[in-house]
Amino acid sequence: MAFVAPVSSVFSTSSKSAVCSGRSSFAQFSGLKKVNNTARLQTAEQGSAFGGVSDANDAFFNAVNTMGAPARTSNAPSMKVRVAINGFGRIGRNFIRCWAGRTDSNMDVVCINDTSGVKTASHLLKYDSILGTFDSDVVAGEDSITVDGKTIKVVSNRNPLELPWKEMEIDIVVEATGVFVDAVGAGKHIQAGAKKVLITAPGKGEGVGTFVVGVNDHLYSHDKFDIVSNASCTTNCMAPFMKVLDDEFGVVRGMMTTTHSYTGDQRLLDAGHRDLRRARSAALNIVPTTTGAAKAVALVVPTLAGKLNGIALRVPTPNVSVCDVVMQVSKKTFKEEVNGALLKAANGSMKGIIKYSDEPLVSCDYRGTDESTIIDSSLTMVMGDDMLKVVAWYDNEWGYSQRVVDLGEVMASQWK
């Protein structure tokens, strides 16, 4: 097994990434109807993609079939890397949809481990309450799911050590259960025969490298990292624009609040939970709770270590969240200069990662957004020339899943 560096050793010195620098093109969903991408946000120069907020819901289900495709790297493998997904929940299924739209992917998804069974897994892939119907041919077999003629084996085992990774010659396991998030747990996939593990959650402890695409993914090394984490959806939202602001203005300290849609970790009705606030009904309450996202930003932007903290407010919406960061900076500035720096990054080094909007939109308008973070420029504030407020939206499922696929492509591009 290759040496795996501690989480804290993985950091960024540049905002540019070989993968994200060309993410201006968009792939088409495999098997989905070709429609104009009317629900995507445009940059400030291009204007709004829809005439008004009332059109957003009508446009969404037709527009969700487009997504950012990563730029190809020069050292792409001659054969596709064999991928298995462990856990077929929200992120696992979103991963399949995102991956299916990549016409030039170096990954080949060959197996899914899901304890709900083939019938349920295929049904939930085909029909989704957030994304709508997956307009591809999804067929449930006896022990497989076929998507537009591509057959993916389905197994069911809760013990990673007993999964058939060796016999199936699995290269990368996308660990999407939310359970095996440390080196010991994720390492069981390697013991079972896989070569690498990509965790779709914040990694815990030593031996897991944390990467945020567009911020520090250029530091990934095939020889150095066996287990990597794609961090959290909120860290993926915060880290890109916080790096831009830190580079440009010098962040002294900051506090963040993410107003976050409810997740499967909460309770539909009041029921037991280790967090007594999360024990309360997600559909009826604003639920204050913890988030490690602010501190985790320092794992990929080390100049921000010890400078950020924050909380989460879980709200009764099923998807899309918004991050509000108030910070003190060392360089005097004003609103237009702050927005200018963010717009420049959105159109340049972080194109496809940061999106910039000057439209008065709401959360539903951002469903299906490919980018990790969408700057709401009209909400930017500057107080006394050194205190900033920046507000950024993010699709905590779809945008995050796009980055999981991107990070998988980074790993696959270095395969030996």
From Swiss-Prot:
Cross-referenced CDD domains: GAPDH_I_C (cd18126), GAPDH_I_N (cd05214)
Annotated site residues (Activates thiol group during catalysis) in this chain: H260
Main subcellular location of this protein, as a coarse class: plastid
Catalytic activity: D-glyceraldehyde 3-phosphate + phosphate + NADP(+) = (2R)-3-phospho-glyceroyl phosphate + NADPH + H(+)
Pfam family, one: Gp_dh_N
Class of the enzyme per the UniProt entry, highest EC level: oxidoreductase
InterPro entries attached to this UniProt entry: GlycerAld/Erythrose_P_DH (IPR020831), GlycerAld_3-P_DH_AS (IPR020830), GlycerAld_3-P_DH_cat (IPR020829), GlycerAld_3-P_DH_NAD(P)-bd (IPR020828), Glyceraldehyde-3-P_DH_1 (IPR006424), NAD(P)-bd_dom_sf (IPR036291)
Positions of the catalytic residues: C233 (nucleophile)
Compartment list: Plastid, Chloroplast
Entry keyword set: Calvin cycle, Chloroplast, NADP, Oxidoreductase, Plastid, Transit peptide
A biological process term (GO) from this entry: glucose metabolic process
EC number: 1.2.1.13
Positions that bind D-glyceraldehyde 3-phosphate: S232, C233, T234, T263, R278, T291, G292, R314
Pathway the protein takes part in: Carbohydrate biosynthesis; Calvin cycle
GO terms under cellular component: chloroplast
S-S bonds: none
Transit peptide: 1-78
PANTHER family noted in UniProt: GLYCERALDEHYDE-3-PHOSPHATE DEHYDROGENASE 2 (PTHR43148)
Record note on quaternary structure: Homotetramer.
Similarity-based family: Belongs to the glyceraldehyde-3-phosphate dehydrogenase family.
Protein name as annotated: Glyceraldehyde-3-phosphate dehydrogenase, chloroplastic
Gene: GAPA
